[in-house]
Design a protein with these regions (language model features):
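Catalytic cores of alpha/beta
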Residues: 49-54, 97-111
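Long, distal/terminal scaffolding or interaction modules
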Residues: 76, 80-82, 87, 97, ...
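C-terminal helical cap(s) of enzyme catalytic domains, especially alpha/beta-barrels
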Residues: 121-150
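Phosphate/adenylate-binding glycine loop and adjacent helical scaffold
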Residues: 3-14, 37-45, 128, 147
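Glycine-rich phosphate-binding active-site loops on the catalytic face of alpha/beta enzymes
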Residues: 107-127
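Hydrophobic faces of well-ordered beta-strands that scaffold small-molecule active sites
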Residues: 18-23, 33-40, 60-64, 88-92, ...
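Glycine/Thr-rich beta-alpha phosphate-binding loop at enzyme active sites
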Residues: 34-83, 132
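N-terminal, charge-rich interaction modules
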Residues: 1-29
Length: 152
């Protein structure tokens, strides 16, 4: 059974409407249910991105596959969808590490989907959204601090 990671901890998966792969996505509105879109690759060409943008108002959840621990394209896609006005749920799944949860949340993901094995290997207490976290490159350097010159 799938385990979801949110800012409140672990929770069971509550999405009941299923997923549609991008290739099966129709432009015809279907008001009977909220769409769940399953993106198996985070790189989309402009045509696919436009297609998703057209159905955003009736999309309840978009699940984006993270291929490897260093794959930032899923984060970029999440940010692009938020910038396009998507307000529904964004879910990351695949190769996710607890220490990247803050990155995922800052990119626009609402939750992370784990397999039972992933949840056992990375328990609830490892998944924290560090609200006061700032990337090292954004921390202002104190005035007059020594800079590395490359010489001894």
């Amino acid at each position: 059974m799938t385990v979801l990671v949110t800012d409140t901890g672990f929770a069971p998966d509550d999405w009941i409407d299923g997923y549609i792969p991008l290739v099966a996505l129709s432009d015809t509105p279907d008001e009977l249910y909220s769409l769940g879109i399953d993106l198996t690759r985070p790189e989309l060409d402009q045509r696919d991105l436009d297609r998703i943008k057209r159905v955003l108002p009736r999309t309840g959840l978009i699940r984006i596959f993270v291929r490897s621990f260093g794959d930032t394209s899923a984060l970029t896609l999440a940010r692009s969808l938020r910038d396009a006005g998507y307000e529904g749920r964004l879910r990351a799944h695949g190769a996710m590490l607890a220490r990247f949860y803050t990155f995922a949340r800052r990119a626009g993901f609402d939750e992370v989907e784990l397999t039972p094995v992933q949840a056992r290997m990375q328990p609830r207490e490892h998944w924290r959204n560090e609200l006061d976290w700032t990337p090292v490159y954004r921390v202002p350097r104190p005035r007059g601090s020594a800079k590395y010159s490359g010489t001894s």
